[in-house]
Amino acid sequence: MVIVYFILILTGVIMVHELGHYLFARLFKVKVLEFAIGFGPKIFSVKGRETTFRLNVFPIGGYVRMLGEEGEEIADEEEKEKSFYAKPAWQRFLITLAGPLFSILAGYLLFLPITLNWGIALPGIDEVVPGSPAEEAGLRRGDIIYSINDKIAFDTSIISNEIQKGLPVELVIIRNGEKKSLRLTPRMYPETYEFVLESAEGTPSGKLVSVNGNRDTSVLKEFVNEYVVLEFEGGTVKGILKQFNEIPARYMIGISFSGLAPVFKKDIYFKEGLFVFKKGDRIVRVEDQEIEGWQDLVVLYQRLTLGKDTMIVSLQGENIEWWRGLSGSVRVVIKRGDSTIEKNVEASFLKNILETPDLLEMGVPRYKPKNPLEAVNLSVKACNYVLLTTASSLKNFFRNVQTGQIVGVVGLAGVISAASKTGLEAVLTVVAVITISLGVLNLLPLPALDGGRIIFSLVEMITRKKLNPQVENIIHFLGFIFLMILFLYITFLDIGRMMGI
């Protein structure tokens, strides 16, 4: 079924894009020979008065083939007038621009019913650090951050970027359905050390005083995979340092954001006919750890990936948090209605639950606009954010190629598969993001892409000199070869990620 979803979505997205080219070509009386979805051999075709409409085997793109577009000679004068290169540069510019424009506009139109029906996801506050600027300003667990410095908080990165400036920020939060403004000033927090100790002995308490007798505790990172003795103000801890991560000092306000909620979305079966957890059950404790929200689930997952003799430690100045790993049978306390129930399950089984999509409820809150006007405003701003983020990601990719930032057709299939398990809203959102991204991607000034053809039209409009169509088509052909190689490379990376390579 996922494959069907994937093909339908990709076909629809491509069709909208190519429809832009087709309609503008017809508007300027350019003869369209073929309107094709996909590449390769045709599955079927329908012959119109002038145009053959084709559905091809590989749904990875599409094209509108116009008369004379490939630089071929046209003997008939009447037919020649209908050819692509017989039209002025400004008309060719608009025909080429129409594809990306239709893609982007389709994304904007799709976001409106999403916003009207489901609202928009906004960052929720999962934890407030005691004594932090957030607590002092009155922020509470469960508050929703609507905007920061007049920027709608479509993503937590928007909040983080504003906070990292270190300047006072203006927050608009939603509490009990009502908006409220708060002003607070970020505070510089010291660097954080996060590390894992194997064969750990002892209990840490207070500030870290020395590492293997050295009072310069920053040397800890030099002892990965070595035995260390850590002196704390309230005790000594020994073990093998297996992992170490240093987070630099940074401005913060003292909050963490919500993610998954510790509530089961469906019945969980240990084996056929024997359920362990029921839909609606809330995890409240696992062994010695209270579970209230997303951050607790993150720590729990870390503990479940480690053995009992392993310790996770997080140090920030004089603040310390530590947990021992969990293995074997673990005690899970759940709330089911008014009842509190204890269950013993294997750590590996609980870990598998946390790893499996769509078993736990989403804890990310949604804000539904009060009226259609606000819905239009929010949907337009959401699309603007997607547009700018896509453009920024492409710019960063070409400046500093990082293969983990990009996905191809196989990767998109995985994204659509995950969205289909979540619900219609997630699927429509993915479609809107894909179609906007397709529009932006096609505007890149690369041969074979619409952006490359737009550049040729602009140059002609400025210089009033037409490049030989055959030369232009050779350039686009070479660009197409490059894009196909890039496509195959990205597909290889997608498959590698799926196989864990």
Swiss-Prot record:
Keywords attached to this entry: Cell inner membrane, Cell membrane, Hydrolase, Membrane, Metal-binding, Metalloprotease, Protease, Transmembrane, Transmembrane helix, Zinc
E.C. designation(s): 3.4.24.-
One CC-aspect GO term: plasma membrane
UniProt xrefs under InterPro entries: PDZ (IPR001478), PDZ_6 (IPR041489), PDZ_sf (IPR036034), Pept_M50_Zn (IPR004387), Peptidase_M50 (IPR008915)
Spans through the membrane: 93-115, 401-420, 427-449, 474-496
Residues annotated for Zn(2+) binding in this entry: H17, H21
Family the entry assigns: Belongs to the peptidase M50B family.
Protein name per its UniProtKB record: Putative zinc metalloprotease TM_0890
